[in-house]
Curated annotation (Swiss-Prot):
Keywords: DNA recombination, DNA-binding, Transcription, Transcription regulation, Translation regulation
Disulphide-bridged cysteine pairs: none
Keyword Metal-binding recorded: no
Gene Ontology MF terms in the entry: DNA binding; structural constituent of chromatin
Gene (UniProt): ihfA
Protein's name in the database: Integration host factor subunit alpha
Gene Ontology BP annotations: DNA recombination; positive regulation of metabolic process; regulation of DNA-templated transcription; regulation of translation
GO cellular-component term (any): cytosol
Segments forming a coiled coil: none
Length: 103
């Protein structure tokens, strides 16, 4: 298994779309900045055929220190969730490991 990084995405844009390396890096950075900004505002980000990102507020809840067993509150927080689209799930499920999808 390998890891796909932002630098890898920029390199793929350079190779497949023909952007120069600086433009490709800027496109990737801008893409993720826009997603982050939308999530910070509380918007839902829907990427058709891929999935949805959204923020959820998690309330404070009781917790326990694993070392001491002492009860302590876990603070309220905001978390990002991702739900894959049915299309993405089907494509990933149908793909054989090590062979990229042709779509």
């Amino acid at each position: 298994m390998t890891t796909l990084t932002k630098a890898d995405l920029a390199e793929l844009l350079f190779e497949k779309v023909g952007l120069n390396k600086r433009e490709a890096k800027d496109v990737v950075e801008s893409f993720f900045d826009e997603i982050r900004l939308a999530l910070e505002k509380g918007d839902i980000v829907k990427l058709s055929g891929f999935g949805n990102f959204q923020c959820r507020e998690k309330p404070q809840r009781p917790g326990r220190n694993p070392k001491t067993g002492e009860e302590m509150p876990i603070s309220a927080r905001r978390v990002v969730t991702f739900h894959a689209s049915q299309k993405l799930k089907s494509q990933v499920e149908g793909a054989r490991i090590g062979t990229p999808s042709q779509e």
